[in-house]
């Protein structure tokens, strides 16, 4: 497998133990997501990747948590999704399109 090229990175704020997985808008420049899983043993991180993979129609293997494995503020890298595509898909999801 060839090395992954420079990824697009995004800063997120995660709210674990929510009722359901959903985008919750922006807070202080960070995209905020609610995740239903508990923040224990990596469950919320796995569910975050699963949710974003479905939402953004991107393979799970192409999304990686770079920083913040044990905190609410995270940096994610997307290896096959451009910043423009990410922003368009997030905007559409936030506005119900």
Curated annotation (Swiss-Prot):
Q: Name one GO cellular component term.
A: cytoplasm
InterPro entries given in the database record: DUF167, YggU-like_sf
Top-level taxon in the UniProt lineage: Bacteria
Indicate the family of this protein: Belongs to the UPF0235 family.
Could you tell me what this protein is called?
A: UPF0235 protein DehaBAV1_1103
- Source organism per entry reads Dehalococcoides mccartyi (strain ATCC BAA-2100 / JCM 16839 / KCTC 5957 / BAV1)
């Amino acid at each position: 497998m060839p090395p992954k090229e420079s990824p697009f990175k995004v800063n997120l704020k995660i709210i674990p133990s929510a009722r359901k997985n959903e985008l919750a808008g922006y807070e202080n420049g960070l995209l905020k997501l609610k995740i239903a899983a508990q923040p224990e043993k990596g469950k919320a991180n796995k569910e975050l990747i699963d949710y974003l993979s479905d939402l953004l129609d991107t393979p799970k293997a192409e999304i990686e948590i770079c920083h913040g494995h044990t905190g609410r503020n995270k940096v994610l890298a997307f290896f096959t999704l451009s910043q423009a595509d990410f922003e368009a898909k997030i905007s559409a999801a936030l506005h119900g399109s």
